[in-house]
Amino acid sequence: MYVYLLGLYLGDGSISTFARGVYRLRITLDVKYPGIINMAVAAATEIRGRPAAVHPQGEDSCVNVSSYWKAWPCLFPQHGPGRKHQRRIVLTRWQEELAKRWPDELLRGLIHSDGCRFMNTGRGGWVCPRYSFVQASDDIRSIFCHACDLVGVRWTKSGQRTIYVSRKADVAKLDEFIGPKR
């Protein structure tokens, strides 16, 4: 569950200081996908050992999965001032080891936060499923691509921020452990 939560954190997560040395882990998710919200709550709850909470995020389309704990910066040492895409993001050695053992969980978290599976269409009426991952951080895109390499999935870049998985066999491989958002 940690590697999945790491993927969510790298995509749409943040850690902020709270009272008395406690930190708040917050993962912002779309309300259209209650299954992903439930998985995020389960992951944060399992790691923390206490129930995570779901709070509305300003507008009606998002919620924050939140958990308070002094240890969050230890588990996510990428925490720091500023936006993740404006600073260096590097996995620690122990995080790399976990990501190598469970690259599928890391990919699931990254896709659930900053990716999607959609039907690509073209001239002549052809339709085929495709995954995209859009992320402003070069470092996080690199982490995504490395995880794809670990599971044997080919990827391509499009523009500065988008990674696609388009080949039929590679999409089928991701479907084994990710699939459409729910």
Question: Can you name each region flagged by the protein language model?
Answer:
Residues 1-182:
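Internal intein/HINT superfamily modules and their associated LAGLIDADG
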